[in-house]
């Protein structure tokens, strides 16, 4: 899942490839320096989690930001693999 500028440059992204049937691994988050500190990573990760839930998948967070995000959002603990 990516946030792009008008020139199609990636300004923020969350990657979550499928690693097992029904399980994705949230393995990478990135936010360009120009957007840091504005809540972009949290917003993008929230959208990724909504997409994962809507697909009926479970998530295995392995990047430090995703691990921290799930700790701060215990209402999504049911999605953890």
Residue ranges and their predicted role:
Residues 1-24, 28:
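N-terminal first-folded block
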Residues 37-49:
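Conserved acetyl-CoA-binding loop-helix of GNAT-fold acetyltransferases
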Residues 47-81:
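C-terminal structural segments of small proteins and small subunits
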